[in-house]
Each structure stands twice: as structure tokens, then as C-alpha cells.
Curated annotation (Swiss-Prot):
Protein's recorded name: Large ribosomal subunit protein bL28
Domain of life assignment: Bacteria
InterPro entries in the cross-refs: Bacterial_rp_bL28, Ribosomal_bL28, Ribosomal_bL28/bL31-like_sf, Ribosomal_bL28_bact-type, Ribosomal_bL28_sf
Organism: Geobacillus sp. (strain WCH70)
Similarity remark: Belongs to the bacterial ribosomal protein bL28 family.
One BP term from GO: translation
Amino acid sequence: MAKCFVTGKKKSFGNSRSHAMNANKRTWKVNLQKVRILVDGKPKRVWVSARALKSGKVQRV
């Protein structure tokens, strides 16, 4: 899975727990969108997290 170009977020790991508290490995995936943004004055298609887009850290081209 890709990671966010702006924030560096990537999938995280942990355990899911049943009612008996048995542990099973699982992952949490980041909500990534492939968007075109300006990088060094040129448009580039990169993976950006939805949170970075909503907070205005990047502008779409």
C-alpha cells in the first residue's frame, strides 16, 4: 500500500480482539486518494490522505 505524500501516513498494525479477548493480527488502512498536485511548480500525481485534502494542506490542480 502507498503512503501519503504530505503527512507520511501509511497503514498501521495491531490486534483485533474477540469477546474472549483472543488476539488476531489486523491492519488499519489510510484513506488515500490519488490526486494531481503542484510539486516544485509542476503537476504530479501522488497519493494524498483524505485528511490532508480536507484540511487544505494541498491544492488539487
